[in-house]
């Protein structure tokens, strides 16, 4: 391995800002402001440029000369920040936002890009070929890269993407920028938001052209940083121009904040007015170093780098006194390319295979106390895997496979690994198949299933309070499920029919966002495939959610999922089960209310009428039209969403409950069934189909 030695000049800029900040306490004097610039980084027009422009195509008449710059630049906050409490192995959550732009040099291709960086070693660099100026893999670091150079050898998906790196230049996950609505090479100023929640073990990244944070993140990755960070880490930015590429990587407005381990979620900061400060703190202290070292509850803000020239004069004087030439050597070689790294490169982090020992360790040997759910073919355990974090382990029971007429493990595994990446779908994290044991590992969602919230019985303990989902939360849940189904039906490469949409399979995250799971019954079709050409299957699913035509023909379709979605909508609005303990059918009950002009009588009494009546009626009507007995009258889920949001007219419902019409595929006659009640369970799966 060849070793290369480089020297860097480190400029310690201490900027004494004598500005008045009305938003801060009058008892508080702004501490000494301090950034450290490395390599090519420099102040430029009230911003920081991490790199310098350099010639890409030197004249053939000009003799080659020694490069004037390393092509690498960094800007780090001078004080290390506490990220880990060693006694409890608790990691701080954090959030930051900053504006940036990447401007290519004339007649030059773009450089490597830049990264938001958290590193244990401020002086560690990988010099060979740039690599965004990231640290040596031997050091602990986390980086969110904004990459503009395509390097397929190291897992890049293209030359315009955002990725998350953890102590490696191989991204654990990445996403194409163009597909998410922004272009890193546009030269325009953009905003980025990065958040890590230690409770959720989740990193999320948002990017947009507006200062308003987008609704959905462009990248979301489940990862536990407790084993990835040191007690104190340095925070800032890093960039590089490698080879013939050259660009200015400019960072302007930057805010950074950490949160204690007790914080359940990242709290949105209000826009502050102290635009002129370089580094300022929201806490009162006479000792500036104390602000940045005292633990989890400190706050560091790096805001607008719009610094008047006169305010730099004291800092320039300090630079003349403090500048020192620090020569150091770094031993670095080629990137370590292991088989594991190769297997994890690509567009997204592919779920990895886990050993049975890891699964047993995660679940304490499949401890009964860790069980959080149980179905016909599998038991779900809560667990923890160091490389992933909190997980839900779905352990399959082979004894029940013959009853399912298929291998549910294989069905769900192939569906999840091949297609599904959506914010409203439970994310697949790994799998195990060893001996007679098979298991799938998913993200753990702390609030459990939607069914538990809708139908939880009062506790005998008077001190235990039942959480009632608000109307706003319920509408958001319905829209989340609709988004997931739209993705499955219309946006995936191949159409996926879930076949088991029900509240038990809708999970809720810490913020009560819906995530659809359990793809053990899913069917996959080409979008161009005709319904008539699909083979009939033995109807499978859950009584109360199955479309009538599916029960009688055995052919699943997008509209059979729509029917199930309609029942879910009614269940969420009313708080009633699809089939009550007394045999009452929810769909029938809602038609009875509709026929008497009292559809709002179906609203959940637990809401105590704390809802918008017009919106409630609109959503109930959507549920009824989606659960229409005639599949041709059901809307697409996407169209149902437009009605719920008031963007489309209300559906037209008949004055009386329509008759159920079944058209057998090979028979001329049609079957007409009037709406019955009680034991016959109209529009439901016949009892003979299920035990």
UniProtKB/Swiss-Prot annotation:
Residues 1-25 form the signal peptide. Residues 333-691 are cytoplasmic. One of its GO terms (biological process) is defense response to oomycetes. InterPro entries: ConA-like_dom_sf, Kinase-like_dom_sf, L-type_Lectin-RKs, Lectin_legB_Mn/Ca_BS, Legume_lectin_dom, Prot_kinase_dom, Protein_kinase_ATP_BS, Ser-Thr/Tyr_kinase_cat_dom. CDD domains: lectin_legume_LecRK_Arcelin_ConA (cd06899), STKc_IRAK (cd14066). GO terms for molecular function: ATP binding; carbohydrate binding; protein serine kinase activity; protein serine/threonine kinase activity. The chain crosses the membrane at residues 312-332. The active site is at residue 500. SMART domains: S_TKc. It catalyses: L-seryl-[protein] + ATP = O-phospho-L-seryl-[protein] + ADP + H(+); L-threonyl-[protein] + ATP = O-phospho-L-threonyl-[protein] + ADP + H(+). Gene3D superfamilies: 2.60.120.200, Phosphorylase Kinase, domain 1 (3.30.200.20), Transferase(Phosphotransferase) domain 1 (1.10.510.10). It is found in: Cell membrane. Keywords: ATP-binding, Cell membrane, Glycoprotein, Kinase, Lectin, Membrane, Nucleotide-binding, Plant defense, Receptor, Serine/threonine-protein kinase, Signal, Transferase, Transmembrane, Transmembrane helix. It holds the Pfam family PK_Tyr_Ser-Thr. It comes from the Eukaryota. Glycans are attached at residues 34, 89. One of its GO terms (cellular component) is plasma membrane. Residues 26-311 are extracellular. Involved in resistance response to the pathogenic oomycetes Phytophthora infestans and Phytophthora capsici and to the pathogenic bacteria Pseudomonas syringae. PANTHER family: PTHR27007. This is L-type lectin-domain containing receptor kinase S.6. It comes from Arabidopsis thaliana (Mouse-ear cress). The lineage of its organism: Eukaryota, Viridiplantae, Streptophyta, Embryophyta, Tracheophyta. The gene is LECRKS6.
């Amino acid at each position: 391995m060849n070793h290369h030695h480089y020297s860097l000049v480190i400029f310690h800029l201490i900027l004494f800002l004598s500005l008045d900040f009305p938003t801060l306490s009058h008892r508080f004097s702004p501490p000494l402001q301090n950034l450290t610039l490395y390599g090519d980084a420099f102040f430029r027009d009230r911003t920081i440029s991490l790199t310098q422009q350099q010639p890409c195509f030197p004249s053939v008449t000009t003799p080659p000369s020694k490069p004037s710059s390393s092509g690498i630049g960094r800007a780090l906050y001078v004080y290390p920040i506490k990220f880990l409490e060693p006694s409890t192995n608790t990691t701080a959550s954090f959030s930051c936002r900053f504006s940036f732009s990447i401007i290519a040099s004339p007649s030059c291709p773009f450089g490597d890009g830049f990264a938001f960086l958290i590193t244990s070693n401020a002086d560690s660099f990988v010099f060979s070929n740039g690599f965004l100026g990231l640290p040596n893999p031997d050091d602990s670091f986390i980086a969110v890269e904004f990459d503009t150079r395509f390097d397929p050898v190291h897992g890049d998906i293209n030359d315009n993407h955002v990725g998350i790196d953890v102590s490696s230049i191989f991204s654990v996950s990445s996403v194409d920028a163009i597909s998410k609505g922004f272009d890193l090479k546009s030269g325009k100023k953009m905003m980025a938001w990065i958040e890590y929640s230690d409770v959720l073990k989740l990193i999320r990244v948002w990017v947009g052209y507006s200062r308003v944070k987008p609704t959905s993140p462009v990248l979301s990755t489940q990862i536990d940083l407790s084993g990835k960070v040191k007690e104190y880490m340095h925070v800032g930015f890093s960039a590089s121009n490698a080879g013939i590429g050259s660009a200015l990587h400019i960072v302007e407005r930057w805010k950074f904040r950490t949160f204690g381990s007790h914080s359940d979620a990242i709290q949105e900061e209000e826009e502050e007015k102290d635009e002129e400060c370089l580094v300022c703190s929201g806490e009162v202290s006479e000792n500036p170093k104390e602000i940045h070292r005292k633990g989890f509850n400190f706050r560091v803000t790096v805001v607008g780098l719009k610094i008047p020239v006169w305010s730099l004069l004291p800092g320039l004087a300090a630079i003349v006194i403090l500048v020192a030439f620090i020569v150091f050597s770094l031993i670095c070689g080629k990137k370590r390319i292991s088989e594991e790294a190769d297997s994890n490169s690509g567009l997204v982090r592919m779920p990895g295979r886990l050993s049975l020992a890891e699964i047993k360790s995660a679940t304490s040997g499949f401890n009964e106390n860790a069980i959080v759910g149980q179905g016909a073919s599998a038991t779900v355990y809560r667990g923890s895997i160091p490389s992933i974090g909190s997980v839900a382990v779905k352990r399959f029971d082979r004894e029940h496979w013959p009853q399912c007429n298929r291998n549910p493990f294989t069905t769900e595994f192939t569906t999840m690994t091949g297609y599904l990446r959506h914010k409203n779908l439970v994310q697949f994290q790994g799998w195990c198949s060893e001996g007679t044991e098979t298991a799938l590992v998913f993200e753990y969602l702390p609030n459990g299933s939607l069914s538990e919230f809708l139908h939880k019985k009062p506790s005998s303990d008077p001190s235990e309070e039942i959480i009632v989902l608000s109307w706003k939360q319920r509408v958001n849940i319905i829209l989340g499920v609709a988004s997931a189904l739209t993705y499955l039906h219309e946006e995936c490469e191949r159409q996926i029919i879930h076949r088991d949409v029900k509240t038990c399979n809708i999970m809720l995250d810490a913020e009560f966002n819906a995530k659809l799971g359990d793809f053990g019954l899913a069917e996959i079709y080409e979008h161009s495939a005709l319904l008539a050409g699909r083979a009939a299957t033995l109807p499978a699913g859950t009584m109360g959610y199955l479309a009538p035509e599916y029960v009688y023909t055995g052919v699943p379709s997008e509209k059979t999922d729509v029917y199930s979605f309609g029942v879910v909508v009614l269940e969420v609005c009313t708080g009633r089960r699809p089939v009550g303990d007394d045999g009452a059918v929810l769909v029938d009950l809602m038609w009875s209310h509709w026929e008497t002009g009292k559809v709002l009588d179906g609203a959940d009494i637990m809401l105590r009428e704390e809802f918008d009546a017009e919106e409630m009626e609109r959503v109930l009507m959507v549920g009824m039209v989606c659960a229409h007995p005639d599949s041709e009258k059901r809307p697409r889920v996407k169209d149902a969403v437009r009605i719920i949001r008031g963007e489309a007219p209300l559906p037209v419902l008949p004055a009386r409950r329509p008759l159920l019409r079944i058209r057998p595929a090979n028979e001329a006659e049609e079957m007409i069934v009037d709406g019955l009640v009680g034991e016959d369970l109209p529009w439901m799966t016949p009892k003979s189909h299920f035990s």
